Structures are given as structure tokens and as C-alpha cells.
Amino acid sequence: MHIGVVLLLWLLPLRPDVQQAALTELSDKAGIVSLQDLTDDLRGRLEIKERVHVTLVDHNPLVMSVETLNGRGGPFVISVDRDFIQELTHAEVEAAIAHELGHVWIYTHHPFLQTERLANDIAMRVVNRSAFEPVYEKVWQRTGIRGNLIEFIGPPSQ
């Protein structure tokens, strides 16, 4: 695993520069969906009981990450780089949010197993694997660091 590509392995206290949640709307065939509603839907499908807030930030060097709001005991917050999310399709946003929720699931169920691959395995319970490929390509393009797709999401199904 390449450290520079890691979206976030450890849940750290929330940075002071994080802005409070904005309900970004995403176009979907079914209409307009808020980023928070999408997160809540995926959280429910993954049976995550803990509250998870979503917020857009002007700059996130990890492009997307999950942290605890008030240290290790507080609610979770997913911080999304405002410019990066504009590059993603609805399916890609869903895959990326599901990945971050995978970190929450791991943290709340297995605190010592916080890995990218496991988070993606959890996320792929509710989103299609093919949505992850362009997400990682865009992360790597934006960060300038390249990773091995199979390390992060496994080999394609046959």
C-alpha cells in the first residue's frame, strides 16, 4: 500500500479548518439527492448505527477522509474536497462515500483492521466495483501518486 494514496487509515480529531456540513446536491435519474441523504442511505444499508456527517472543505490533501468530530468518542465526519467531488459522477461519489463508510464500519467493528482494501470490500457490499476504478484514477491524478488498483479493490470478477 502506498502511504500517499491512503484516503485515511486512522481516525484523527477533526481539523479546525473543516467547515460544517453543507448538503451538496447530486443529480441522479431519480432527481436531486443531497450528499448527506446519500451518506445516510449507504450508512443504513451497511447497518452502521453511528451518525456520520458529511462536509465539503476548500482543501483536503487526502481528497476525501473520515475522522471523528470530537476526538475518538465523537460522531464521525466525512470531509470531501469541494473541487474533487465536482470531478466525480454520481456512481463514483457513491463509491467513494461507501469506501469512507467502510472505514467507519471497520473502526466500530474492528478498530485494528483499518485498511484500504477492507474498507473497499465493505463498500462493495452496496456499490459496484467498477465505480472504484475511476475514483482511484482521479485520486492518483490529483495527488500525483500512483497506486496498484488490484491492491485496493482486488481483481475484476470473472
Residue ranges of model-derived segments:
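Auxiliary, metal-adjacent structural segments of Zn-dependent hydrolase domains
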Residues: E25-G71
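Short helix/loop segments within enzyme catalytic domains
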Residues: L26, S34, F112-P155
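Soluble non-cytosolic domains of exported or imported proteins
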Residues: K29-V33, E87-E92, H110-Q114
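Sec-exported extracytoplasmic/periplasmic mature domains
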Residues: R43-E47, I106, A123-R129
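Active-site scaffold of zinc-dependent metalloenzymes
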Residues: H59-T89, L101-V104
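Active-site recognition of the HExxH zinc-binding catalytic motif
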Residues: A95-T108, N120
